[in-house]
Amino acid sequence: MLDPKILRQNLEHVVEKLRRRGFEMDSDTFLQLENKRKEAQLAIQSFQTKRNQLSKTIGMAKSKGENPEPLMAEVSHLNDELKQEEANFETIQKAFSDFQLAIPNLPHDSVPDGKSENDNREIRQWGAPPGFDFTPKDHTVLGERDNQLDFEAAAKLSGARFVVLRGSLARAHRALAQFMLDLHTDQHGYEEVYVPYLVHEECLYGTGQLPKFREEQFQVAGDRNFFLVPTGEVPLVNLARDEIIEAPALPKKWVAQTPCFRSEAGSYGKDVRGMIRQHQFQKVELVQLVQPENSYQALEEITRQAEKVLQLLALPYRVVELCAGDLGFAAAKTYDLEVWLPSQNKYREISSCSNCEDFQARRIQARWRNPKTGKPELLHTLNGSGLAVGRTLVAVMENYQQADGHIRVPDALKSYMGGVDYF
């Protein structure tokens, strides 16, 4: 959520920045709501002043032995009017809050202009795509051996965009997740956290999935108001809800492996085959909570930490800076990591690392105590995929495939795979 002070004091600047990301803010509606809010606030103050004055007059009348009943009746009438105006003010505040919740974050000044992923800017590449003396196969074909990648069984259980993994592929999937967790906890200083996979609606409001992306969420039927997590970012960031963290305890660096559940409502016809786009997938998520002045340094750090997974697996990739028009709703700046897939002869997204500045922190009131002032201030929140496990498995299968259809085990993964060389 944007700072309402910025909206009130520098509306034109906000409108222009939002326009960079293709969002047209309705400034007329904002001004109307703001005027109504001010009018209601003044009316409440006026009623309160009159009531206080009458209360003093009643006290004086009683001290003089005069009948205070007419004045008390007037106070009672004022109280009724005050309650009505307070209810009106709450209605206006709710409309104002709903208006704010629909506004995305402002892009950082360093974010390049652009409308879509076609305008994203490549920052760097690492590794060279492998050369094959045979035509490389798609991961779905490679997975057909021993029926280890079984979409038919998954469809029988759950429908399209699900998968059943068996045997060595299931083990490789588990091994990748364990490898990522060990790297981030042992070498990158993250605390591993196990979190619920069902969260309250307010958690999704806190991180920005709601209200805009409701159709992309899986909501549990019944009266419990639970949602399945679309990303580990949601429970991890919300751990700081209504917290005040002391400065020496920062930065907070949390990592969790969770399933992610997404309806893919806007993805009809995209990646219908294989494991690239699924309703359920595993992801190792990195989250940092930092002091505001350190957040862009933290963004570079979290990106390099996600890159390290790909480097240790020797998977070719590139880093792309998202243009303003391709930014996620809560992000001020984002880097995507894209891994090389031989069967598609192109790079595909495998990680997204974002600085949300104080956008999420304002929604959940996640704060730190500034030792210079002694007062609580909003934190900056960052998140990054470290990595999407299923897509990493796809990349390993395709980049390490052999002519006979077997997959060579990356050196970094051998100890997690029982020391075997191929699967």
Swiss-Prot record:
The listed locations are: Cytoplasm
Listed GO biological process terms: selenocysteine biosynthetic process; seryl-tRNA aminoacylation
Its EC number is 6.1.1.11
Q: Which reaction does it catalyse?
A: tRNA(Ser) + L-serine + ATP = L-seryl-tRNA(Ser) + AMP + diphosphate + H(+); tRNA(Sec) + L-serine + ATP = L-seryl-tRNA(Sec) + AMP + diphosphate + H(+)
Q: Which domain of life is it from?
A: Bacteria
Q: Which residues form a coiled coil?
A: none
KW Nucleotidyltransferase (keyword) present:
no
Q: Does the keyword Transmembrane apply?
A: no
Keyword field:
Aminoacyl-tRNA synthetase, ATP-binding, Cytoplasm, Ligase, Nucleotide-binding, Protein biosynthesis
Q: CDD domains given for it?
A: SerRS_core
Q: Where is this region: Disordered?
A: 107-130
| Gene Ontology CC terms, in alphabetical order | cytoplasm
- Which biological pathway? Aminoacyl-tRNA biosynthesis; selenocysteinyl-tRNA(Sec) biosynthesis; L-seryl-tRNA(Sec) from L-serine and tRNA(Sec): step 1/1
Which EC class is this protein assigned?
A: ligase
Task: Summarize the subunit comment.
Answer: Homodimer. The tRNA molecule binds across the dimer.
Q: Which family does it belong to?
A: Belongs to the class-II aminoacyl-tRNA synthetase family. Type-1 seryl-tRNA synthetase subfamily.
Q: What does this protein do?
A: Catalyzes the attachment of serine to tRNA(Ser). Is also able to aminoacylate tRNA(Sec) with serine, to form the misacylated tRNA L-seryl-tRNA(Sec), which will be further converted into selenocysteinyl-tRNA(Sec).
Q: What is known of its domains?
A: Consists of two distinct domains, a catalytic core and a N-terminal extension that is involved in tRNA binding.
- Protein name, UniProt field: Serine--tRNA ligase
Species this chain originates from: Coxiella burnetii (strain Dugway 5J108-111)
Q: Which gene encodes it?
A: serS
